[in-house]
Amino acid sequence: MSFPRGSHDLPAGNSSPWWPLTTEGANSSREAAGLGEGGSPPGDVRNEELAKLEVTVLAVIFVVAVLGNSSVLLALHRTPRKTSRMHLFIRHLSLADLAVAFFQVLPQLCWDITYRFRGPDWLCRVVKHLQVFAMFASSYMLVVMTADRYIAVCHPLKTLQQPARRSRLMIAASWGLSFVLSIPQYFIFSVIEFEVNNGTKAQDCWATFIPPWGTRAYVTWMTSGVFVVPVIILGTCYGFICYHIWRNVRGKTASRQSKGGKGSGEAAGPFHKGLLVTPCVSSVKSISRAKIRTVKMTFVIVSAYILCWTPFFIVQMWSVWDTNFVWTDSENPSTTITALLASLNSCCNPWIYMFFSGHLLQDCVQSFPCCQSIAQKFAKDDSDSMSRRQTSYSNNRSPTNSTGTWKDSPKSSKSIRFIPVST
């Protein structure tokens, strides 16, 4: 898991790249005994027990990520409900997570199984490009999803100005930027042939950097582009969102307190031509429960992303900026698994979607004939929930003997809702 210190230095450690940012990546199952004197090319040995652990963890992550995100895509495709902008972002974030599974985790899994890269030079470059492309896509799709929630909460009027077109442009920009920013991988990585300690020839997919600053510049740039900058943007957006929600809640609380001394009839709303008029705060000043729910969901996704990827990038930066850092000192199961679990983020997201959007799980279950009993239970629960909402609506209607006068003021910042009542 080391980096080359010169233009053609070979890594003094491991070679199977589950670290897509590093030279040879991170098959940390390479034993320290495989190192030659003075950091010479490694011998052709590795810790097989640790290698088996890596393969097992990667295989589990791959299967869970593919099944989870495929289920979300199937549910979104089969849902009878009208799709929203949030569904569009969830669909593309699931596609980005599938890209992580197939372009990053799967090559790493195959590489750990074969130990050495077994393929031509062009395949080495393509694999390295797709590995980083998946990382960029997953991060940037999360950024545009959070930006959409920021616009919906803090600038609701803009959601009325071709929101679908803007959302698609944001998603297309995320995919395009991810592809472009990962193109340098083609020029950095290549298949390099070297001689191991026992005198035999071997080849692997490694990077070539300009000494002495090339490695640091590369890893710092990748860490900033994939992790640091997106996290700053995400934090800024959520700072504004939280402030806007806090201000909205405070305004509603003050409004209720100011109306506390008024009669129930006046608080409920006056009559006008047989209609019960109930003022409701305009969408400019109010935040719906649906928006709050999607904000909560996005916040949990962002938190999972930060928790999963932070150890990975900390070790990356530590390895290139600490001159005393030695990979063989940290090649143990705990360090290896911590870094491997970075891709666990792609496994978590589907379950977060289904937790916050219950109908996705219901629609997914209904897609499988073997799960009809579970689907019927979901349908019953959904019907009971609808009945409770209708009962609550009926109980909250104002009495027909409410009194008051109706006045339509064009200067009012409140919209008017008319509810027909019997007289």
UniProtKB/Swiss-Prot annotation:
It is a multi-pass membrane protein. CDD domains: 7tmA_V1aR. Keywords: Cell membrane, Disulfide bond, G-protein coupled receptor, Glycoprotein, Lipoprotein, Membrane, Palmitate, Phosphoprotein, Receptor, Transducer, Transmembrane, Transmembrane helix. It comes from Mus musculus. Residues 388-406 have a biased composition (Polar residues). Residues 1-23, 382-423 are annotated as: Disordered. Disulfide bonds join 124-205. The chain crosses the membrane at residues 53-76, 89-110, 126-147, 169-190, 221-241, 299-318, 337-356. The keyword Cell membrane applies. It is found in: Cell membrane. GO terms for biological process: calcium-mediated signaling; cellular response to water deprivation; grooming behavior; maternal aggressive behavior; maternal behavior; myotube differentiation; negative regulation of female receptivity; negative regulation of transmission of nerve impulse. Belongs to the G-protein coupled receptor 1 family. Vasopressin/oxytocin receptor subfamily. Receptor for arginine vasopressin. The activity of this receptor is mediated by G proteins which activate a phosphatidyl-inositol-calcium second messenger system. Involved in social memory formation. A lipid is attached at residues 370-371 (S-palmitoyl cysteine). Glycans are attached at residues 27, 198. Residues 1-52, 111-125, 191-220, 319-336 are extracellular. It comes from the Eukaryota. This is Vasopressin V1a receptor. Knockout mice display deficits in individual discrimination. Male mice lacking functional AVPR1A (V1aRKO) exhibit markedly reduced anxiety-like behavior and a profound impairment in social recognition. V1aRKO performed normally on spatial and non-social olfactory learning and memory tasks. Residues 77-88, 148-168, 242-298, 357-423 are cytoplasmic. The keyword Transmembrane applies. The modification Phosphoserine is found at residue 409. The gene is Avpr1a. GO terms for molecular function: peptide hormone binding; V1A vasopressin receptor binding; vasopressin receptor activity. PANTHER family: NEUROPEPTIDE RECEPTOR-RELATED G-PROTEIN COUPLED RECEPTOR, VASOPRESSIN V1A RECEPTOR. One of its GO terms (cellular component) is endosome.
